[in-house]
Amino acid sequence: SKNFITPFDREDIHALASALDDIADYVHGSANRMYLYNLTTVTEPMKKLADLIHLGCKDIHKGISELRDLKNIRNVTDSCVRINSMENQADYVFDMAVADLFKNETNAIELFKNKEVLNALERATDKCEDVANVMETIIVKNA
């Protein structure tokens, strides 16, 4: 019988898979809300948050690829730093977008619909940061 040897703990693999699933859940949730709430306009902040999620996911891919053999730890930490920076940018975009909604949107229902979509997108960026945290934990345990 052959055993599958993992490069790191099963708990870390589970944490990584769960965090990745959370990103997908929030991205799906934002699209689902747009559909269910019949939102026909994608606002600039929504586009910006989607772009930031995409950047975060690209860095997640880079980081996870480097975790396979743990030879290029610096590349993983660089990805994690970029993901953390992306999440901070997303917080700013979200805060400004919500402030703009409260300032300019006179229809309370439209305000709520847009805020819900923005919130789901922003939470996806938070989950990207969670993945970065798991990758950093794996590095610390295996360095």
Residue ranges and their predicted role:
Residues S1-A143:
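Cytosolic, long alpha-helical scaffolding segments
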